[in-house]
Each structure stands twice: as structure tokens, then as C-alpha cells.
Amino acid sequence: MSIKVRYFASLGEHVGRTESDLEFAQDLTVRDIWQLDTSGKPIPENLLAAVNMEYAGLDVQVQDGDEVAFFPPVTGG
């Protein structure tokens, strides 16, 4: 399974990169992707995730060829 992972805004600094290309043999969830790609870093409070540009929960199953994006909550005024 091939997955593209992107980290936006401060999360790129938090994990030390803005994107990764991953290869896995087993089925994974969005949460699994975070844990494996960040070497087990704690999941930030209010983390937002998207799969193929649609908001997704951390327990959503990821498919081959998907793009998973992580980003902090959007704020503004």
C-alpha cells in the first residue's frame, strides 16, 4: 500500500517534515499513519485530518493511493 502524507502549518515543524511517501503491507487507519510516520509522537489536541481532501476521523481506514493530510485547527478573527 502506497500513501502520501502531508503535514501543514506548525505540524510540519512538529514532525520535522511537510510530507512523506509511505509503503505499508497491512491495512491502516489515519491514527496508525500518524503513529508510524511520526515515530509515536503524541497526537496533538484538536488535530484535524483529511483523506483525499475530505475531513476524516482518526479511525478511518486508509486505502492504497490515498493522500492523508494532518493540520492544526484553523483559527482566525
Where in the sequence are the language-model features?
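Ubiquitin-like/PB1-type beta-grasp interaction modules and other compact soluble beta-rich domains
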Residues: 1-76
